[in-house]
């Protein structure tokens, strides 16, 4: 709005415009004069001067640019043009009048008008001529254009057809190339690419040539199903070849490599680690062992390094694309079943009504019929005839390789080929073991003989079980075989112990063990289990005394202890590295084995020796049995502490302890019977003259023999017996002896006896009583807490005090108790000596004859009184007296048996 009063053209711009106009006018005038001077120039170039009038000086135009640009920037170009036109009218308004008043200018104008008229005519002629020519040329060009256009259209149609033909030919060539490529790929065994090319070929044909009747293309298209079938057949053949490659000798190699890595790398590393870290309670393949394995060893167990399964991947993709995966699975299973059949050879199923089902179940990995019994093993079976340790190892290695292959194949193919049965490998393994177990049991029972072979088979199968366990396969059937091997090993160890013990028993001298070497003595003490608190008084080497010790047991005991410990160590070593399942079962087998050693072998074989008639041998057996009972108890304690279950609350007690104790009682009985028999034999030789009229001062020679026998027997032959047994025997024999003499006096004497014979009989009885202190040791030793006599040196047996009782007091009490056995007999003798003069007085009778029954007293008095009244008639009865003097008869024997209970009371007295 403010700009409306202001001129849009600045003074500077107006001056430029005016300067330009004046300059152009003068320039035009000069050129017009020059043109007039040259007629030819005007004639030939009439339009040139006219156009030059309107030419602008470029320099002048450049001067306009800043002003025009400014107007453009302000969007004022149109107003500037309008104002410019108005300015021209304003500036040149009086110019026409000025020109008319100028005569020179008028002349020039007239001349110019004529010239302009001439120029106009000339221009018209020229234009007409040019237009004619142009029309002719235009007509020619139009015709030419029409012709060329027609040619172009024709060419374009041809070109289009050529292009279409080219495309078609290209596609045909593509089909031919695909067909040819399929053939090449089939030859190269790249079947998945074959399928891709066939798919492309089919799509290309259906899209482009379905409506064409090209016979060769139709033939190519019709060959697609055939090529697909060829591809499928070749894939199946490829799988067969892959199975041939992987399931041949390669299986044993794979099994060997796996077992070798476990046996030669993982196991030695664990044994070293276990020893260093004192992890003896942990077994191989336990969680702690697995956690400590070297990763470099585990890297060698990558199944992908052992088996090539690329062919399976291609085949699965091919059949998946063809939607015929079930066909592949069926063909694969058929082929796989054949491989499994070859794999199991020479294992053959018995032909029975369930054989077909069992075979099918095994091959399919579904096990056997539920509830089916174990298969019988025939010695004519090829598998049975092939059984050997080497054969079984190779067979199991082959099976292991197959199991690993099956596991790897199923995982790599995502269990597609087994219908997503994730337990297929386990089912096959269980079915195989169900069939194989009877053969293994047969081999263990019948053909596995040596401990070396058992250890080899055990180590191999334990490594085998570890591998199966790490691959999550069922180890139960094979572990049962390992338990059977352990049972067989224990059985063989038991037989070996039996053989060696029999040799030891036959070589044993049944004499106390004398040792002259201190080192040997210390070894014996370490080997043997001794009685609690038992010790020896060893010679003092500083005094120059030779080392000499006699142990109460015979050499059989330490040798048996050594043999038992070695056997136990051997058996536990058999279990120490691998066995870590079913420990209760293994522990029961171990305990039973040791029980059998102590009972079925040691106890029964020693018990058979009790048929001996040697008192010394029976006595030594009794001593040995005492120590074997201790050994069995200590072995029970040892097995409790070291039990393989590692259970601190478990207590093991061998049942053989009871049977050994029974044998000990039997040995006591046998020893008593032998002593009784010997004493009875001696008593049969004793003859007492009851009619004698002379009194002798010395005992009868037969009484002296009897006393010497008793003294020798108790002081030497039976000196190593336990103190309780010695005491029992002493009391029993003296009680039996006094009762037999009592029976002799009451029932085996004639109706009349002389006073002198009574005096002589008293001398004999007093002599027998006098040996009592000599039978018991004069220097008491020590007795252990169980009442056993301690071992001794060859010279002197020792009798300890028991349960806190002073040994001398016990010694005195025993002598007094033993002397009391003669009391009744001595009272009878005293009654006969006094002829019963004071017997009728109650006070005296109770004091002097308390042990004599009234009927016995009456019987005795009748004999002595009868003798007094009929001395003369006594000589006629000598024969009857002699006939009745034998003291060993059935009545006296019954007296011995009836007094057993009373002997026990004597033994328990203090």
Curated annotation (Swiss-Prot):
Family, similarity comment: Belongs to the SEC15 family.
Membrane topology: Peripheral membrane protein
Residue positions where Phosphoserine is found in the record: 286
Note: Present with 4280 molecules/cell in log phase SD medium.
Role according to the record: Component of the exocyst complex involved in the docking of exocytic vesicles with fusion sites on the plasma membrane.
GO cellular component terms attached to this protein's record: cellular bud neck; cellular bud tip; exocyst; incipient cellular bud site; mating projection tip; plasma membrane; prospore membrane
Keywords (A to Z) from UniProt: Cell membrane, Coiled coil, Cytoplasm, Exocytosis, Membrane, Phosphoprotein, Protein transport, Transport
Subcellular location: Cytoplasm; Cell membrane
Principal subcellular localisation of the protein: cytoplasm
Residues in coiled coil: 88-116
InterPro entries, A to Z: EXOC6/Sec15, EXOC6/Sec15_C, EXOC6/Sec15_C_dom1, EXOC6_Sec15_N, EXOC6PINT-1/Sec15/Tip20_C_dom2
Quaternary structure (record): The exocyst complex is composed of SEC3, SEC5, SEC6, SEC8, SEC10, SEC15, EXO70 and EXO84. Interacts with SEC4.
Protein name per the record: Exocyst complex component SEC15
GO molecular function: small GTPase binding
Pfam families: EXOC6_Sec15_N (PF20651), Sec15_C (PF04091)
Gene Ontology annotations of biological process type: exocytosis; Golgi to plasma membrane transport; intracellular protein transport; vesicle docking involved in exocytosis; vesicle tethering involved in exocytosis
